[in-house]
């Protein structure tokens, strides 16, 4: 390959990665630049005010997982919050979402992406962010998928006047083929290139964030300034002679993918799993999640599903002809998430998943961004809203993954889709 291999969720996103690789950047430069461009071209799926996970596989070095998912703010029981539900119409069905100032968790995307660039990138940050600046100023043409998201998320995107100005610039909602421009976001990127993440978490940008959150939100200046990216050792397992690296706890997704692969790997059958067995593995994995990881606010509980005693219990279920698994669905969630995978010509691998939820409904006009609504996501708060026992990372299904063989990296992958992403990644690996 001349420059590398790239997979992303939108044409402009992928083009940014290509240009950065072409101009001498590595996979980490390209991934960081591509994600910032996706905040324009895939505005409804990700943003600086969301959270994510970046699995980096530097050539000739062990992979490392950069966890920059969102944190819960300090609990303030009894506080009056701007927190309310809306219905999003998907056509055949409607789904309830919770938004408002009280739905905003402490964002991690900006800190995380800039940390990865600082640790592993080789081009200047300004050069990495330039394509995203250009996309924001010149605009991107909305494709069918993004136009659909704008349509169904209209109640959230246009909840504030600033949102109306951005998505109804001529008085009507942007549609497929229209140009989406966000020059204020380009200005934010200029400030990040000049001042780094401090602008967003402690400087003038932080002031604008806190002003938007107001007194009916939970974020404070202190918790925003104290946000930290966590470098974790990836969850490592063997499957089919390959080595699988993925997102460890408090990610539920990476843990459950590893669990499912181990069920298949340790199954008594020597035959390649058929669709019936694969379905059974997925059902058992969902059951294990409910029975073993039921308190996802307890980070120590999540890895227990991989303990030998637990794994053997579910392996016995898999190896029987019939199963007594209670068939319950996972919490409903369509997911508003996107992913970028890159392998450069040197052999560096980058797998990064990011999200902004559905957005909290309030645009920060000066920055051109909408913060997340993670405190209003039912699948992230299964015990109820605003009930976390302490300030902590929220759990996530995100599972950026790298598969290696004897000759190095063989597969770089990940997915959006919330509860659906683990089954998608599992099937691709198999």
Predicted regions and their residues:
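Active-site rim segments in enzyme catalytic domains, especially the processed small/beta chain
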Residues: 40-66, 217-220, 348-411, 419, ...
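M16/insulysin-pitrilysin zinc metalloprotease superfamily fold
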Residues: 254-269, 403-411, 417-430
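Internal maturation/activation junctions in enzymes
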Residues: 268-355
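Noncatalytic scaffold domains of N-terminal-nucleophile
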Residues: 1-19, 25-196, 200-242, 248, ...
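A short, polar/proline- and glycine-enriched secondary-structure boundary/capping micro-motif
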Residues: 74-80, 255-259, 360-366, 420-426
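Extreme N-terminus nucleophile/cap motif
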Residues: 7, 16, 203, 260, ...
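Glycine-rich phosphate/pyrophosphate-binding beta-alpha loops
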Residues: 245-254, 337-341, 351-363, 414-422
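Generic beta-strand/beta-sheet core signal
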Residues: 33, 240, 247, 258, ...
